[in-house]
Amino acid sequence: MQKTLKRYFPIFVLPTLIAFSFAFIIPFVMGVYLSFCKFKTITNAQFVGLENYIKIFADKDFVNAFGFTLKFSVVSIVTINVFAFILALALTRKIKGTNLFRTVFFMPNLIGGIILGYIWQQMINAVLLKYETTLVANPTYGFWGLVILMNWQMIGYMMIIYVAGLQNVPTDLIEAAEIDGATSLQTLFKVKIPMVMPSITICLFLTVSNSFKLFDQNLALTAGAPSKKTAMLALDIYNTFYGRNGYEGVGQAKAVLFFIVVAVIALGQLVLTRRKEVEQ
């Protein structure tokens, strides 16, 4: 049986490998090459070396977008995971209606980013108009509007992962801690959190990557206004590639650099958190 599987393994893998190559590997390699070119279309690409990458660091919009994205990501990662974990703790207690609450908290994650952006734009502006201002009048309003939107969308999803982790904590350990006289806080920090580190690793990875890659919510909520001060990296790349004539190569270079930054940060976070995981 094993010999038969090994014999036909390439036949089953080959279609997937071909599809993956055409859908990801070839476009990725082509994208990296085009980041070193000046082009209108891929048929008239002219190699210009590092010129596009030099222009990136002279672009104030990119520098501002990078700083804004970094600040937004730090705040979102902390708030999403803290609130999601608190909700998970509450919903793993023996209270009525936990399944209903889990469903309600998870539902915002099912709504598209563009729709969420416009919904929250209307809601926040309805409040701000009472004070004779709008969401795009001040970068601070746009920043916190994006944070609120991101939290509302992601907390329910992260909560489900934390709930699964908390439910897998051995009850023997919790009972042993209680017998030893540990308080609720001591049990939380010494038993539960170390045991749910795999869930924390997953949630941190997802929030890090999603925070940095945020695009459609940013486009719908503020579109970078005022004066591109609330534009995040993904939106800045879009504006450069499609909105600035002759800057297609620069936009592609920004996309490659963006991929490297997100990959390094996400992989670094995975390494750091996995070191703290406890074998069960």
Place the predicted regions along the sequence by residue.
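A structural signal for multi-pass alpha-helical bundles of membrane permease subunits
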Residues: 2-280
